Amino acid sequence: MIILAEFEFPLATGSRIIYESLLPELEEEYQRTRSTLRLEQDTLILNVEADDLVSMRAALNGWLRLVKISCEMTSMHKL
């Protein structure tokens, strides 16, 4: 069974910085998950494909945490 998830993050500012900060995470290869990340204008689009629910949950926890931290760091930089 293949499980697919797609998330769109509309980012007002810093979209390019956030996108580029997350790109190195795609270099790591995993046996049961595959991820893609793209930037369309100011929207970050994350696609995750997993072989099972446990793998999907783990991958999403990691990716969502990374996106959240990147957004927080970008907003702190503006202060």
Where are these regions (language model features)?
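Hydrophobic alpha-helical segments
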Residues: 22-24, 37, 65-66
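Short glycine-/aliphatic-rich beta-strand segments at the starts of folded cytosolic domains
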Residues: 1-11
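C-terminal structural segments of small proteins and small subunits
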Residues: 53-79
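Low-complexity, flexible helical/coil segments
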Residues: 6-7, 40-46, 71-74
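Short amphipathic alpha-helix segments
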Residues: 13-28
